[in-house]
Amino acid sequence: KKTALALTERKTRYEIIEVLKAHTADEVVKALNRIEKRLGASFYSVFQTITVDNGSEFKDFEALEKAINRVGNRTKIYYCHARSPQERGSNENANLLIRRWLPKGSDFDKILTRDKVKNVEEWINFYPRRLFKGKCSFVLFQEELALL
């Protein structure tokens, strides 16, 4: 059964959403591999750490951390405490935005396509943020990438 992985960059709140074929650890690793390939060397600076919940899809921390484009690790995985979503606050807020377009309980096998996810991702990343005085995450993320 399809699902989605949402990765929130901490500083700019830039959102990356990947479609997963199944809710498994192997699919999450594949998604991180795709993101690492897409971002290239900047992945290692942008996602120095990733905080995840204690779901079974995140159980293989060694595979999640292992880089595919260089020797060693791509990131460091941290697990939040059980029933402590506030430890992943930015990601939880992003999940609320995602749920506007992909409601919980929806049949993701029918509605979850790469195009649909891309549209949701763009809507979130171009949404003006009060936190950033009306700027959007996309512009801020591009500015941060230019500094790397």
Task: Annotate the PLM regions.
Residues 17-42:
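Active-site beta-loop-alpha junctions of metal-dependent nucleic acid enzymes
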Residues 13, 50-53, 88, 124:
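Short, conserved catalytic/metal-binding motifs centered on acidic residues
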Residues 43-60, 81-83:
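Acidic/histidine-rich, metal-coordinating catalytic segments
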Residues 12-16, 41-48:
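Short, surface-exposed connector motifs at secondary-structure boundaries
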Residues 64-73:
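Short, surface-exposed basic-aromatic patches at helix termini and helix-loop junctions that form
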Residues 1-16, 21, 32:
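Short conserved beta-strand segments at catalytic cores or DNA/RNA-binding microdomains
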Residues 60-63, 90:
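Short, well-ordered secondary-structure micro-motifs
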Residues 74-148:
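Charged alpha-helix within mobile-element recombinases
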